[in-house]
């Protein structure tokens, strides 16, 4: 287990760095080559490893015997609780990384990439395994008999403490603060302690408690708990997604701009495009209108909730002749802009600090949308906020919400960051977007003279469990 985590530490440090500076070819190619070498080394030992010959139907008889079924049932009950552990633990590669993007990642004199923080877990495993084996376990065993089940039980409670820690950190982020990454590393220490007590103990327990011919099956049951935990997390994340009304139009636009291998558009005539748009349905089951503009651009119109064109629920997406999205227009444009001005005025008057969610909501609550509901405000982090019209259904967090998302770019005082060479990712952005991409890269580095606000309009497309609420949900 220590050997596995030594490899995990090295790969978790190097892979994000290779991806950032040399691209996916090396970042994923090198691990692929190393896996091939590992397979070859394993093959070289084929004459030294112990080979257990298949026993035919004896395996079936023992597996489905009274003892075999009793063993699997007992372990399945234990592993069902362990599945909850994996539902939380494996989020270190997803929600924890996203949280790290909003934290101050300068730690130990190094500016860490968000994905590199995961390397803390395997290196802590290497340190903590001997500490637990030769220090903590013997001490606890003097207080009460420390059985494998008690180790697992204690580990599950410790996991709750670790996830509560990142929940608190996310609360700070939700309030516009930028906590140190050290807080998340502290949570990693708690999480790793839980892993030592749960994962290692379960691996040992599964092997020692299984009948000789069933060891692989019992190990598979343990690994099934990992899958179940991830299925649960995936199910929650799927359930909390709010449908995005703009997807139908943006997907249609990609089809309109599609070209064959010779660079010729597949839809070459106006009739072809009109036929396609009339057959394409939005999430409400309505067709999409296509209108050409004088300057060569075109507009795709979604009818919205009422299914009728020419009403306040219409959503207009304007695209350039080359297919670049220029604007999203809705009936809420004026209201959202008015609210945006109020939030920006507060920002300018309060030392470049955004209002917290409740303060911002109070600031714009007098602005009423076209359907009689006050606008809503949410602070996402210190550099992002959302202003929302509830839309025609008057319900928050639905596909009819019309949302202005604003992102703040701030000048950086660190001159070395501005002058360092472009990474592979930054060069790729510039290659794909040209001058616009270069501007995007410079802005992300803080190479601008003054604070800038970028805004985008979305219709739906949010998540109805976010921020600290998301982390507290899994904690409880």
Question: Which residues are covered by each model-predicted region?
Answer:
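Cytoplasmic loop-to-transmembrane helix junctions
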Residues: 2-3, 147, 154, 179, ...
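A gly/Pro-rich, aromatic-decorated transmembrane alpha-helix motif that marks the paired
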Residues: 5-21, 164-168, 228-240
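Hydrophobic core of transmembrane alpha-helices in multi-pass small-molecule transporters
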Residues: 166-197
């Amino acid at each position: 287990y220590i050997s596995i985590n030594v490899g995990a530490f090295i790969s978790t440090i190097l892979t994000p760095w290779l991806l950032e500076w040399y691209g996916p070819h090396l970042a994923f190619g090198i691990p692929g080559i190393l896996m091939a070498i590992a397979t070859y080394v394993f093959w070289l030992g084929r004459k030294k490893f112990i080979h257990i010959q298949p026993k035919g139907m004896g395996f079936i008889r023992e597996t489905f015997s009274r003892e075999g079924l009793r063993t699997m049932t007992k372990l399945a009950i234990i592993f069902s609780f362990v599945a909850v552990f994996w539902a939380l633990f494996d989020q270190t590669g997803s929600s924890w990384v996203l949280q790290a993007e909003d934290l101050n990642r300068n730690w130990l004199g190094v500016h860490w990439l968000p994905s590199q923080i995961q390397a803390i877990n395997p290196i802590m495993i290497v340190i903590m395994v001997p500490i637990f084996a030769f220090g903590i376990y013997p001490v606890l065993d003097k207080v009460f008999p420390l059985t494998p089940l008690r180790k697992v039980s204690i580990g599950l409670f410790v996991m709750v403490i670790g996830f509560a820690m990142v929940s608190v950190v996310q609360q700070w982020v939700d309030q516009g603060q930028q906590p140190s990454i050290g807080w998340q590393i502290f949570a990693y220490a708690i999480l790793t302690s839980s892993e030592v007590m749960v994962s290692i103990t379960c691996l040992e327990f599964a092997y020692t408690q299984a009948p000789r011919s069933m060891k692989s099956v019992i190990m598979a049951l343990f690994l099934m708990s990992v899958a179940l935990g991830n299925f649960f997390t995936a199910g929650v994340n799927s359930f909390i997604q709010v449908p995005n009304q703009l997807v139908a139009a943006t997907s249609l636009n990609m089809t309109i701009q599609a070209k064959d291998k010779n660079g010729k558009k597949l839809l070459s005539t106006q009739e072809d495009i009109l036929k396609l748009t009339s057959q394409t349905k939005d999430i409400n089951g309505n067709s999409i209108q296509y209108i050409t503009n004088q300057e060569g651009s075109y507009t795709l119109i979604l009818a919205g909730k009422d299914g009728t064109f020419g009403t306040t629920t219409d959503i207009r997406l304007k695209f350039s002749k080359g297919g670049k999205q220029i604007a999203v227009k809705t009936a809420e444009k004026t209201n959202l802009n008015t609210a945006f001005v109020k939030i920006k005025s507060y920002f300018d008057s309060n030392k470049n600090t955004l209002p917290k969610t409740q303060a911002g909501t109070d600031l714009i609550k007098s602005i009423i949308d076209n359907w009689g509901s006050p606008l809503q405000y949410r602070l996402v982090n210190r550099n992002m906020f959302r202003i929302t019209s509830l839309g025609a259904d008057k319900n928050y967090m639905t596909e009819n919400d019309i949302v202005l998302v604003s992102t703040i770019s701030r000048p950086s005082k660190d001159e070395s960051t501005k002058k360092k060479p472009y990474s592979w990712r930054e060069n790729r952005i510039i290659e794909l977007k040209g001058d616009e991409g270069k501007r995007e890269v410079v802005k992300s580095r803080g190479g601008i003279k003054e604070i800038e606000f970028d805004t985008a309009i979305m219709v739906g497309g949010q998540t109805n469990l976010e921020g600290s609420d998301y982390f507290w949900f899994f904690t409880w």
